[in-house]
Amino acid sequence: MLDTIELSKKLISFDSVTPAKQDIFDFLIKVFEENGFTTKQLNFDGDGSYEVINIMATYGPTNTNGKHFNFLCHVDVVPPGNLEDWDTHPFEPTIKDGYLYGRGSEDMKGCTAASMVSVFKFIKENKDFNGTISFIITGDEEADSINGVKKVVRWLKENNIRIDGSIATESSSEKIIGDQIKVGRKGA
């Protein structure tokens, strides 16, 4: 069984400044498929923006009477800026004084890893689960946010894929937890 900290560290080790590159998605696809998910890579471009890689990983049939619950995540990060300003390298995950440091440790690679590990554990412990769980992971939340979630939602509609509920485990907010609902928000 995967460990949240170890998966977070692996995700942090990918330099995935917006738009996130293929290597982190290849890794995610492998992890999802090893845990019984089917995956679909969704690349979108146009509308005056760059090409963005997105994936949808799905567990369970989509044509049952069960509900379809989704986790909405992103693995792109803002540029780290001047590397000399960092105490540790942004893409070399480091645990110091009980904290995990590295670009994306909070927004949102750590949250993505925690969601994945939790769902994998749920599936393992609930073999009779009658429903569908999916992850939509985009590579463009921290910048334009044009060829990520917006186009994935359009693709879902075009393919008659209905999601009954979704949660973005994004940990950022303006003043209090839950005060922001947006398609994209630049962090750091």
Language-model features, listed with the residues they occupy:
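Acidic/His- and Gly-rich active-site-bordering loop/insert found
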Residues: 1-101, 124-129
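Fold-level recognition of mixed alpha/beta catalytic cores in primary-metabolism enzymes, strongest
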Residues: 100, 110-117, 123-188
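Loop-rich non-cytosolic ectodomains and luminal regions
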Residues: 106
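Short secondary-structure boundary segments
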Residues: 4-28, 109-112, 163, 167-180
